[in-house]
């Protein structure tokens, strides 16, 4: 939902994402962007499509794919951050399973989805223009999750490992609200944690997935916010004294001098994050659920 909300927030985000995914050179892989109603609210959904099952891929395979991607579509800093998130994901699995990093492979069902979710979110976050990302506390959820290694209490082992150093909490949701992939991306993008920044909302993006609880809206909302002046200024037209902030309710980052703000005290899986660079991008987690399938489809398995 982070990817979907960012593509909705950013003008031209849908086209930017589609062209970038095509440039990855993965045979038969594309994205489909559509709109769907979630409890009466229009949201955007992004699906990763594969014409044929992709082979199991280790981290080195993914590194090679990203390295070969043309910088016209995948700037060097996007590649660097994307690979950092994928590496975090693999390292978490390596730690919890006690396996060497080179033995960790991305699940055959979720490998391509994970790559597109991760790199796409970083790309769109960069395109928004924010230079700093701040996240609100991450709701990890509660209850149990079942994947290839059995049934585990939430957060699953890899999620708990990834949550180290992040500001988290657990609401009585009875379900997993923060996936390993989502945590890896957020941890890579966020520079710190804090409340929703003060400012004027310029744009909103709503992202949803396939899961719905029926109890509360399952979407992630992203905001683009123009922050107030840093200091008193005699001339209201003097833009040099103000910041632009972007916030996202469970969404992603922004571009420029902004903040990316994630969930803030809500019952969803993503924390609020805002990037500062004149603009702030924020994302809210006031909705529950996430767009991935069972834990095994968005994490890794070991050989």
Summary of predicted features, one role per range:
Residues 1-7, 106-129:
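Conserved phosphate/anionic-ligand binding catalytic regions in large, soluble enzymes, centered on
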Residues 8-97, 156-159, 164-169, 173-183, ...:
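Glycine-rich nucleotide/cofactor/substrate-binding loop typically near the N-terminus or early
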Residues 46, 113, 186:
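Divalent metal-coordination and catalytic microenvironments
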Residues 30, 103-105, 132-134:
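Residues at or immediately flanking beta-strands
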Residues 95-106, 115:
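Non-catalytic, charge-rich alpha-helical accessory subdomains
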